[in-house]
């Protein structure tokens, strides 16, 4: 927007002809893009505004249900890049000595493509977040946050005789929501349809069969690790695009567990809500000045 009128005046295409890309991460003077079935490194070395370097670092990830594809690459506290989703597979790459089998869990990579390995826990939609201590939180459609077990995958798998039921646990004991928008008419119609309503109740419970009031599309959690916004430090935010709000909660350590609780004075409100049913926050990030940036997928319907 060169004249500040709120309308795009010029568009530059830096890279194209990629598979559907569900996240990018800066690395090695370029970016790493996750676009199933590949993880691709892109860079512009001659400064002409186009990425002439394109290297497939890893290949072999499944291309299936959209919300299960690998997504949200970000640097971890250990200088690996963490990526969630992907549904596993036998992964190959030009810088790997041998193919690596990745189960249906999250994983981490070296940015030069020399290593890839599973990590504990996985998200059920999009996104995950770290706190200052390196604890990782993932998310599902029906809860604002899930704590990943503190034991790394590489330790759990050293003993093949140990049976681990799950490497993650629900950190929140609630799933109710308080949007300010009215549900879209299609959601109300779906809830009153006897066939569809029964299908959703039988398969997912009542939370998925009523127009709103419960998490159904929680995604993109973010623990605010800056101090520029008073009162938000170390709290967790999460998007709920289907109900047009951003959720906020605090993280409490209770013994060896980390639990998510609504703030005492915010028990029946959300951090950010809109009455505009086209407002669909889908991603959160912290800017260099400490502000929270929100990606709004502004369209009429989110089908969840």
Predicted regions mapped to residue ranges:
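Beta-propeller domains with acidic blade repeats across secreted/periplasmic ectodomains
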Residues: 1-304
């Amino acid at each position: 927007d060169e004249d500040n009128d709120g309308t795009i005046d010029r568009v530059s295409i830096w890279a194209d002809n990629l598979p559907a890309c569900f996240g990018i991460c800066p690395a090695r003077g370029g970016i790493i893009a996750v676009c199933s079935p590949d993880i691709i490194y892109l860079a512009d070395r001659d400064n002409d505004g186009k990425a002439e370097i394109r290297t497939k670092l890893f290949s072999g990830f499944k291309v299936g249900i959209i919300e299960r594809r690998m997504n949200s690459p970000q640097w971890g506290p250990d200088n690996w890049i963490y990526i969630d989703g992907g549904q596993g597979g036998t992964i190959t790459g030009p810088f790997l000595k041998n193919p690596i089998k990745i189960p249906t869990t999250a994983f981490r990579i070296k940015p030069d493509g020399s290593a890839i390995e599973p990590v504990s826990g996985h998200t059920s939609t999009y996104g995950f977040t770290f706190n200052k201590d390196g604890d990782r939180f993932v998310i599902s459609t029906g809860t604002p946050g899930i704590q990943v077990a503190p034991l790394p995958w590489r330790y759990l798998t050293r003993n093949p005789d140990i049976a681990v039921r799950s490497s993650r646990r629900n950190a929140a004991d609630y799933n109710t929501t308080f949007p300010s928008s009215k549900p879209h008419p299609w959601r109300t119609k779906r809830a009153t349809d006897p066939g569809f309503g029964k299908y959703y109740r039988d398969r997912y419970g009542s939370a998925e069969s009523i127009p709103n009031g419960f998490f159904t599309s929680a995604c993109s959690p973010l623990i605010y690790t800056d101090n520029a916004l008073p009162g938000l430090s170390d709290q967790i935010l999460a998007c709920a695009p289907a109900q047009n709000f951003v959720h906020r909660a605090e993280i409490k350590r209770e013994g060896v567990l980390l639990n998510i609780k609504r703030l005492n004075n915010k028990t029946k409100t959300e951090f950010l809500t809109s009455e505009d049913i086209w407002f669909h926050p889908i991603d959160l990030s912290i800017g260099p000045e400490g502000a929270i940036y929100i990606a709004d997928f502004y369209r009429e319907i989110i089908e969840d």
